[in-house]
């Protein structure tokens, strides 16, 4: 029986994540104040809704920035993966906050629909256009140069996207009010934008919960991986006890492999590691090699045979 443990060179997030979050926070916080003033002066719910989104975004971006900074801390004997999971926790909290604030806006919009209030369409238009430009800039900052599926940055970008959609909705509502004077357009557009934001927030919430519960990445088919490994490396007769979860942005795996006793243990382990790295981008894997068939009630819960042996 043999064990192997391989690591990626670094689990630390890229510095550009922190820079993008900081710039986006400055832009979002600044224009949030502008929209609060504009919403109060114009009486527009769409602007106030967008300002509410931006307030949540500013807090979310700050939380995300702190999470990235904490995640840079090196591993310790107590926190052996460092603080990488904190970014996933931040994404979860951000998603919850976005769902709550959006539901509150929908509730207020429904009340506004039945009791319309006067809205200054021209001022609303000016502020909405300025907010749209700010959101476009912040959204571009968060996506520029990003080549990793960081849930934390994704959560922050989702908040900004909600504001971007809110600004578009406010512009459309302002145009309708200016041309027709029909003020219910303001809460109606707020509800339509909120529905779009809720859909994306729910998806993010599911992904972050899956990571917090140490579920396997949605994009990874464990059964297919087991069959692929047994097929590509003939010495591997059986793969079982496979566990995969995410720590920050990196997948982590443990597995047991029943193998034909090799002449060179290290060479076989290296081939398995290379396979996992190049085929599935798993750089952190703990592999236990076994020479006997797996016995016990847990073996068949996660087991694939290459066809070399039969199990009873």
From Swiss-Prot:
| First-listed, main subcellular location of the protein, grouped into a coarse class | membrane
Enumerate the UniProt keywords alphabetically.
Cell inner membrane, Cell membrane, Ion transport, Membrane, Transmembrane, Transmembrane helix, Transport, Zinc, Zinc transport
Would you tell me the Gene Ontology cellular component terms? plasma membrane
Q: Which InterPro entries match?
A: Cation_efflux, Cation_efflux_CTD_sf, Cation_efflux_TMD_sf, CDF/SLC30A, Zn_transptr_ZitB
As for subcellular location, the record says: Cell inner membrane
Membrane topology (UniProt) = Multi-pass membrane protein
MF terms per GO, please? zinc ion transmembrane transporter activity
Q: Name one GO biological process term.
A: zinc ion transmembrane transport
Annotated membrane-spanning segments are 21-41, 48-68, 90-110, 123-143, 164-184
What does this chain do?
Answer: Involved in zinc efflux across the cytoplasmic membrane, thus reducing zinc accumulation in the cytoplasm and rendering bacteria more resistant to zinc. It may contribute to zinc homeostasis at low concentrations of zinc.
Q: Which family does it belong to?
A: Belongs to the cation diffusion facilitator (CDF) transporter (TC 2.A.4) family. SLC30A subfamily.
Note the NCBIfam families from the entry. CDF, PRK03557.1
What is the protein's name according to its record? Zinc transporter ZitB
Organism of provenance: Salmonella typhimurium (strain LT2 / SGSC1412 / ATCC 700720)
From the UniProt record, report the name of the gene that encodes this protein.
zitB
